[in-house]
Amino acid sequence: MHEKLTTRFAPSPTGYLHIGGLRTALYNYLYARKNGGNFLLRIEDTDLKRNSKEATKAIIEAFKWCGLEHDGEVTYQSERFDLYKEYVKKLLDEGKAYYCYMSKEELEELRAKQEAAKERPRYDGRYREFTGTPPQGIEPVVRIKAPQSGEIVFKDGVKGEVRFKAEDIMDDFIIARSDGTPTYNFTVVIDDALMGVSDVIRGDDHLSNTPKQIVLYEALGFKIPQFFHVAMIHGEDGKKLSKRHGATDVMEYKEMGILPQALLNFLVRLGWSHGDDEVFSLEDLKKLFDPYHINKSASCYNAKKLEWLNTHYIKTLPFEEIKRQLKDLGFDLSVYEKAGFLLDLLRERAKTLHDIINGAKSIVNAPQNYDENAVQKFVNENNLELLQAFANTLKDPKTGKDFEDFTNDFLEKKEAKLKDLAQPIRIALTGSAVSPSIFEVLEFLGVDECKKRIENFLKVRGK
């Protein structure tokens, strides 16, 4: 019996961490945390030819970025081959598994006959009860003695009761290859059992593996965990999510300026809901998440929803957290004077962290050039003269409200309107016709810097 609720995430390090994988990890993490249990990380790196140290590092980095803390040390399957061999031997000694000496040519011949007869390709069990002399020159595989009739039945936490007919889904499948390396289904069962995994939340692409794993659990005398098979994430066109739908690598989202809080909030809702609520902090989710309420049907990736959530978190997260995330992207906000004011200036309109970075640079650094389209659209002889007069009379405003009052008084005296002056000021100060509130930009820069930038712009325009 499992002493403590324990979940795991077990990726193969053959590529980057896909957002579907991150959702699986998140579901396992939340369920463990809700129940005061353990959340384990296991790297399934038995495929020594395809494994990548960079991929392993990227998976761990993605966890760190998202704030998903696993319990204990990371388990690497590549360090457990001796353990797997012990359990292969155990099954052989107990007569629950056997050596199969079928050659590659014999296997191909069998499959050709089955295809010709329009039968499902399957191993015919010829070495299941073999007691003769093994053929020479053949390195055998090890096969499990699987049920040949009846049903494999289990209660899935998402899909309900699932039934597989033994004859439809399995033959005596291989648990150890001819070179002695164990197969995927075998290592998963050994590790989940020995690591005390009580609940397995994973994609429903693993559903067909489950009956084979149950056969192994029973053969080894291990307790079968509770399974939850989650439907895949689809693109907005209804097809399985892929790169053509946008970014799929978790760390690409970081580089795009997406906050981890937004990404996790977005992913948890792709398959799970709590009433009509849309926004959940990680702490909220640790209390609310229940895998028994995961939707049975596939979820649809909605880029606009992710953008909306990212905008929300940019507006609402504490200054120190935004500053930390910006620094992680190579932008140190703290080097600027009035950094908190600058962030508040920019975060209201920002959809990504790059909007803050680009906005900060455009305000803090005097423009080296000016958006020519904006100049053509908003600047003319009349408002250049108005801009010159504005700079000449600008003396003592300090706050945004001061600048607003000063500007309104100035425009009233000149019998002009704000639309005649606002865009030329924006262009002069930032090089662009797009910026936060012009009065707050004026406050941030201060009178001297504003006058300096306006004078420089007028000089460039020949004034």
From Swiss-Prot:
GO biological process assignments: glutamyl-tRNA aminoacylation
EC number from the UniProt entry: 6.1.1.17
Record keywords, A-Z: Aminoacyl-tRNA synthetase, ATP-binding, Cytoplasm, Ligase, Nucleotide-binding, Protein biosynthesis
Main location: cytoplasm
Name listed for the protein in its UniProt record: Glutamate--tRNA ligase 1
Annotated ATP binding sites: K243
GO CC terms, sorted: cytosol
Signal peptide positions (record): none
UniProt organism field: Campylobacter jejuni subsp. doylei (strain ATCC BAA-1458 / RM4099 / 269.97)
Catalytic reactions on record: tRNA(Glu) + L-glutamate + ATP = L-glutamyl-tRNA(Glu) + AMP + diphosphate
